[in-house]
UniProtKB/Swiss-Prot annotation:
It catalyses: ATP + H2O + 4 H(+)(in) = ADP + phosphate + 5 H(+)(out). It comes from Triticum aestivum. This is ATP synthase subunit alpha, chloroplastic. PROSITE patterns: ATPASE_ALPHA_BETA (PS00152). The record marks S363 as: Required for activity. F-type ATPases have 2 components, CF(1) - the catalytic core - and CF(0) - the membrane proton channel. CF(1) has five subunits: alpha(3), beta(3), gamma(1), delta(1), epsilon(1). CF(0) has four main subunits: a, b, b' and c. GO terms for biological process: proton motive force-driven ATP synthesis.
Length: 504
């Protein structure tokens, strides 16, 4: 039997003592006293911050929202079905953050930035707080670059600039998502990173949007953040902030970004659900008192940065759903007051076959012509006024028995102008073709055509102009001005097309 000598024992003991590393860890731990409906109440978490992440024994995470004298109200970032009364909860000491990187482009993720498209993990070396402060006044500059949507009605009369917040508002099934997705499709080749945030949508609707992006080649510059209708309210509430954090990552890297929130009504409803379950006092329409702050802190993150920060931008297009066209409800009025204008989609126009169903009369962009190229200003300057006068005259004509020749001509011109604003879905037009289209309508070249022929004529004109007068596109894209030479080329193309069209 082998025996250890005293000096060997001494040596082993010395080595063990030297290797001993005394770690004292202090953890903030509490116990669950109540759980259900996506809410947990915890006792014992004495030194916890508002918004701090907590971790339950079975792995579910949550966010501390209510800090009360006797307990802490936690909203769960999962179903929480395995959480038991009396189980331990650990405060992490961290605020919610997500990984960010270029690798997110082309992917579909959830509100925690975890991939849900089955294409494997996303490698990211950096992270950003989900809720970051908005850029300060000094960090910004005024909006001056156009963000082309590809929709004639918007780019000519309700222009959107890079760094602007423009609300898309309307009843359900009026084409709000179509306007937003067409805008994303039109950013192809423009160097704009797009983020589409789907909040509380049907999974089939989100799948349809993602399929459209794949088919049109838009997914390579787009990130989709999706929380479906069956997701916990906490994740539906977080999804827009996650999208904003991903867009900010690119904005601060001197890139231009576009973010769509589809839609903020669902986020407000999720927040209302959480607040009522946490027993916060309800206000108007049962929303909590800070529902304005919910949206203002999100939308203020959209900005055009100054030259010191690289002139990146984040353009936000929030969507809000109205009930029976009531824009005076709580959430619509809140978001209208936060944004730099609104695009109002009308159910009546949609049902009348005018699509996109944009009501140009009450839609407005508070940035205005600062976000238009000079050529568009020159050609489309008076078109909004002409359409407004047409709508007024049309209402009057319903009661008048006989109209004079001038009024009849004005009505005929107005009908053709309204016709040229029609566009099929997923068919955005480049700005040069939009200018040619508007010029043709406002200068009276469509007056001799039947209304049913207008769009066919314009489609053929745009093709003819592209094939026979490529210089027109070069002049507009290089000088951004509607020069005399461009006008001569366009007039020639219109006359040639009118002659060809009359022979058909």
């Amino acid at each position: 039997m082998a025996t250890l000598r005293v000096d060997e024992i001494h040596k082993i003991l010395r080595e063990r003592i030297e290797q001993y590393n005394r770690k004292v860890g202090i953890e903030n731990i509490g116990r669950v006293v109540q759980v259900g409906d996506g809410i947990a109440r915890i006792i014992g978490l004495g030194e916890i911050m508002s918004g701090e992440l907590v971790e339950f024994a079975e792995g579910t995470r949550g966010i501390a929202l209510n800090l009360e004298s006797k307990n802490v109200g936690i909203v769960l970032m999962g179903d929480g079905l395995m959480i038991q009364e009396g189980s331990f909860v650990k405060a992490t000491g961290r605020i919610a953050q997500i990984p960010v990187s270029e690798a997110y482009l082309g992917r579909v993720v959830n509100a925690l930035a975890k991939p849900i498209d089955g294409k494997g993990e996303i490698i990211a070396s950096e992270s950003r707080l989900i809720e970051s402060p908005a850029p300060s006044i000094i960090s910004r500059r005024s909006v001056y670059e156009p963000l082309q949507t590809g929709l004639i009605a918007i780019d000519s009369m309700i222009p959107i600039g890079r760094g602007q917040r423009e609300l898309i508002i309307g009843d359900r099934q009026t084409g709000k998502t179509a306007v937003a997705t067409d805008t994303i499709l039109n950013q192809k080749g423009q160097g704009v990173i797009c983020v589409y945030v789907a909040i509380g949508q049907r999974a089939s609707s989100v799948a349809q949007v993602v399929t459209t992006f794949h088919e049109e080649g838009a997914m390579e510059y787009t990130i989709v953040v999706a929380e479906m209708a069956d997701s916990p309210a906490t994740l539906q509430y977080l999804a827009p902030y996650t999208g904003a954090a991903l867009a900010e990552y690119f904005m601060y890297r001197e890139r231009h970004t576009l973010i769509i929130y589809d839609d903020l009504s669902k986020q407000a409803q999720a927040y209302r659900q959480m607040s009522l379950l946490l027993r916060r006092p309800p206000g108007r329409e049962a929303y909590p008192g800070d529902v304005f702050y919910l949206h203002s802190r999100l939308l203020e993150r959209a900005a055009k940065l100054n030259s010191l920060l690289g002139e990146g931008s984040m353009t936000a297009l929030p969507i809000v759903e109205t009930q029976s066209g009531d824009v005076s409800a709580y959430i619509p009025t809140n978001v209208i007051s936060i944004t730099d204008g609104q695009i109002f989609l009308s159910a009546d126009l949609f049902n009348a076959g005018i699509r996109p169903a944009i009501n140009v009369g009450i839609s407005v962009s508070r940035v205005g012509s600062a976000a238009q190229i000079k050529a568009m200003k020159q050609v489309a300057g008076k078109s909004k006024l002409e359409l407004a006068q047409f709508a007024e005259l049309q209402a009057f004509a319903q009661f008048a028995s006989a109209l004079d020749k001038t009024s009849q001509n004005q009505l005929a011109r107005g009908r053709r102008l309204r016709e040229l604003l029609k566009q099929s879905q997923a068919n955005p037009l480049p700005v040069e073709e939009q200018i040619a289209t508007i010029y043709t309508g406002t200068r009276g070249y469509l007056d001799s055509l039947e209304i049913e022929q207008v769009n066919k004529f314009l489609d053929e004109l745009r093709k003819h102009l592209k094939d026979t007068k490529p210089q027109f596109q070069e002049i507009i894209s290089s000088s951004k001005t509607f020069t005399e030479q461009a006008e001569i080329l366009l007039k020639e193309a219109i006359q040639e097309q009118l002659e060809r069209f009359s022979l058909q």
